[in-house]
């Protein structure tokens, strides 16, 4: 008859997803009153649509599996696309790392702060940060030839003399991120930092970061890892999730608890 909160990031996705499903089943068979799956990093989130024929929509499949498993509620941080919430048949609490990042950016005391999005798809997220930080926004536009292969990139907006903070939901190979950072320095930016919620950091990511002109990459610990670059700094989501879980247990409004859930 207890409320059970299962905390499991799905990375690597397949093994950890299966483990989560088994834990949900175990809790259900033990007569748990409510089962909440706390998934800091939602694997397969980038498979949210069909970009070409004969490909799966992995995010929808995973949502179906979780919904059918007996879970009563999902809690996750910075989904790759907001519409993934609609894939589930159970309530989804979509939390935002801006609750952690905004304060950290404010503590930098940057004189000429401007927020940047590394692509057009992240412009909404960048605008939320800009509003919270009372800053302007610039957007990078890129032509991607294939996955993780970057074509030409341009900046919409001026960065000359600015301290740029790039905002994104995740960083994988860091190709887009470092190319954007170097382009901004070439266009007169004083400094470039990046805040990305999920640090996948695969392939040559660390090498790209070390070779680039980016000052610092700040990520959260939604994906457990040992980081091989002095440019990477990690912020824990533990207290953030703990406060959210406490609000759920007390039947309090999450949107009232966190400002970013009102954006």
Predicted regions and their residues:
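PRPP-associated nucleotide enzymes
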Residues: 1-263
